[in-house]
Amino acid sequence: MSKKRVHEIAKELKGHGIELDNKEVVTELAGLGYDVKSHSSSLDDDQATAAVQKILDKRKPKQAAAPVTAKGFVVRRKVGPPTGSGVYDASQEPSQAASDVSSPPSEPVHEASGAEAAASERVPEAAAVQEPVAEAPRAAASEPAAEAPKATAPVAPEPTVEAPKAAAPVAPEPTVEAPKTEAPVAAAPIAEAPTPPARTEVPVTSGRRAASCRGAAPLPCSGKDPLALNSSPQSSAAFCPDARNPGDCDFPSTSGRWHAWPSRGSSGRFAHGAGRPSGWTFARWTSGRPRAASRRTAVQRPSGRAGAGASHGLQRRKGFGAGAQASGQPQNVTMVGGIPHAPTAPDARALRPTATQAVVISRPLIQVRRVTPTTSSAKQYPMAPGKKAIGEVREFKVVPDHAGRGRELVDVSKNKDKSPRKRGGPNDTSISKQELTDLAWGRVNIPLRGKKKKPTKKGAKTQITQMAEDKKVIKLQEGISVSDLGQRMGVRTSDIIKKLMGLGKMATANQMVDADTVELIASDYGWKVDRVGFEVEDYLPEVVARPEDARTRPPVVTVMGHVDHGKTSLLDAIRAANVASGEAGGITQHIGAYSVTTARGDITFLDTPGHEAFTSMRARGANVTDIVILVVAADDGVMPQTIEAIKHAKAAEVPIVVALNKMDVPGANPDRVKKDLANHELVPEEWGGETIMVPVSAKQKMGIDLLLENVVLQAEVLELTSNPSRPAVGAIIEGELDRGRGPVATVLVQEGTLRVGDAVVTGTDYGRVRAMNNSRGESVKEVLPGYCAEVIGLSGVPSAGDTINVVADEKAAKQIAEHRGMKERQSELSKVSRETLDQLFAKTKAGGGPKELRVVIKADVQGSAEAVKQAVQKLTTHKVKVEVIDTGVGAITESDVMRAAASKGVVLGFNVKPESGAESAAKAEGVMLRSFSIIYELIDGVRSSMEELLEPIRTERKLGRAEVRNTFNVPKLGTIAGAAVLDGVIKRGAFVRLMRENKQLFAGKMASLRRFKDDVKEVAQGFECGIGIENFNDLKAGDIIEAYEIEETRQSLT
């Protein structure tokens, strides 16, 4: 069963005339005993109907007034008299006319109905007051010149809105006979009735002047005359005595019919030359809903019929025309606008309209203007019915304007080929769009209701202008993406990518482009590039070089050579120290800086590692040094790292001093070494060259003084000077993370003096110098040019090879470091890794690409971490790729383990050990931790891990064959084959293959091997045994059992 909510019941009550809001309806329903709490509560239909009826009985709503069917304005038209009728002369027999018009019926056929009686009771008494009729009616009866006016409506066009004829059943009408002249009309109540108020000027709604009727002789009316129903001051309109004809008067229209009756004291005469009686009152034209069919308006047809329709209407409503028609008076009197007119001769003045008729038309929602089609357009639409009558069918769509107030009609019709009609274009045979709009809608503009739209000025047309040349400037910092560059210049991104392709650069829309490339592209479009980026030089102190400030500084000497050629041992001999004995594996894996005092002055030595993995270290040492000592073993000769050191020294353009070490070894051959060095453009002085070669022995400390003397001599030739008074500038030789001291940087000061408390910046790290230690471990307050020290106080471990600068304050240092970090991030984001054809081929061949070994590298110093990273990346092959996830300095921490676990990688430590928390985390996450102290072992361990990722190669090796002679069924074991070994050997647990009639029947694993109820490991050729096979019992005599085993071998990385 459906339900109704409380708010729906409230709407239903509102339709019955009871205005209650939702809360009041809830209160009413609760008082009636219904369980409702809010407007959303619901009741069943039968309960809701009963509740509505109870509330209606309780409230007893007033009967709603009948709705008005036609709310409109009045359009009045002037209508002339009927054809053939003249101007009625009121002077001709006025008494007779008055008597005929106002004679009451004397012998009605039946009494008036109750409805009529009730209606007459509601009429004000003033409307029924009449004067006693004297001799005027009898005299009027004898006048032959005047006829009783016909009971017809005024001759005028039919009103556009008529009262419905079938609105109510027709009540019986009284039949009125002609009045008897000898029967005077006299009634006692009439004489006692009070005199109605004098009718004064009433304003006319049409705006015309108001008028009042002149006093005249009274026109007697019947006491039951329904014409008096509308004689109250509220329903009467105005008196118009001053108008020349009836058409000059305007009457407001509120009801729906014209009613006329003689006013009190009027004589009923029609003045000659006037268009209306002077003593008549005209009521309004009523357009309300008829209460009965008897209230239909009588209309005078143009045909001149004094039809029953006209007379019948007047008889029912007014009782006016019936008496006149039944009196036997002449029928040539014409009623015009409810006024009797006598036929007279035609007059020129009579051609003017003599009556006014109100036509009620429906009020449209908006005012419209009917547009008459032009002659050319009207010809295209014939009036004949049919499909061809309207010509081509067009569809129009109403489209609102941007403000949502106006409307526009858009032609959306289609041609015969179902395609949209083209907009625009000349067409001689078709009419304009505006004419079609007017014809289709009959209106030009459809404004919305409400506030009037203010007239707007028509905007100027958009003009395309060119940007001034001085404004075509792109302010650029470091780089810009391709899409941003196109947006700034107003060029499509695809066009810029084409330009980049023309320059040989493949870039995407989000890829960063450097400033130089931007200048090339912008110049093609007429733009200029203004570099307004962050400049580090603006934050660095300006230094004016003055010769008088220069001071001599000690030379910086780098010892380079192949591994195990005695570089560190030579430095130990120079420093009188024993560093080599403490190195792991007897090799140097760090770059060391030492300051040595000799008889000829101070010398700063840099010890570089000789292993191939430390190429970058050697390169950095060559770049910051003044002189290179190339150590070559006399018994070993020139080796690969020796050649590499020569290249680094030549690239740095520094002089080379060759030390022929190990001269005390029996197999030393210095001449062969000199010959090999001459092949690399290092010709000794005794051979006519410029290279100094000194034979030395580090263990025997032979030739050390001669070597130092040549180094100092070379430094004097170079004339090494610097300005110690300027802000310090140096180079980072090495960086490490000390557990107690934090980030530590080994700094070689090149210019100025570095002091404790200076704000420094290096790379992306910055800080303030808190402490410094020299090469001997002593704390110092300042470091002069040409010396090195360990600096503590940086924000992070610096990268080896970076430049360190002293700035004004720590804020400036931070800004420089952040700017450099941003540039690095942009550079990383702009990198696009593209696969080569070989890589794609290898990925396809390997079925999805090569395997990947992900590693996290931790080392004791920054240089070693970088060297390990480069060495590991060089191990990448087409089968296994090594990807370094992260590189750091310091002990292995728990975060390193979690990072490796997230990427399913391993952690490699070089000269560091894991913390206790890192070991437990590695066991929990299943991450492998591997620590190394020698670079050789680390590389071998990484290579082994790479091979483990590859699938092993499985090969099959035959063991022997056995023939089934008999079968036995053993409980819990199944079928056992009694077999004899034909060749080879049968081993327990081997894989077996069962052959029957030279076809493989089954392949599986051997379950058991016995000989005389004893389990044996193997059975040799010529012996018998019992063989059981897993999950197979279908054994028959004559079957062959082949035993074999599978060997796995590790794949090679190449």
From Swiss-Prot:
Region named Disordered: 57-213, 225-248, 287-315, 401-436
Region described as G5: 697-699
Region ranges (G3): 607-610
Keywords: Cytoplasm, GTP-binding, Initiation factor, Nucleotide-binding, Protein biosynthesis
Main location: cytoplasm
Family matches, as PROSITE patterns: G_TR_2 (PS51722), IF2 (PS01176)
GO molecular function: GTP binding; GTPase activity; translation initiation factor activity
Similarity comment: family membership: Belongs to the TRAFAC class translation factor GTPase superfamily. Classic translation factor GTPase family. IF-2 subfamily.
Function: One of the essential components for the initiation of protein synthesis. Protects formylmethionyl-tRNA from spontaneous hydrolysis and promotes its binding to the 30S ribosomal subunits. Also involved in the hydrolysis of GTP during the formation of the 70S ribosomal complex.
The name this protein goes by in its record: Translation initiation factor IF-2
Organism this protein belongs to: Stigmatella aurantiaca
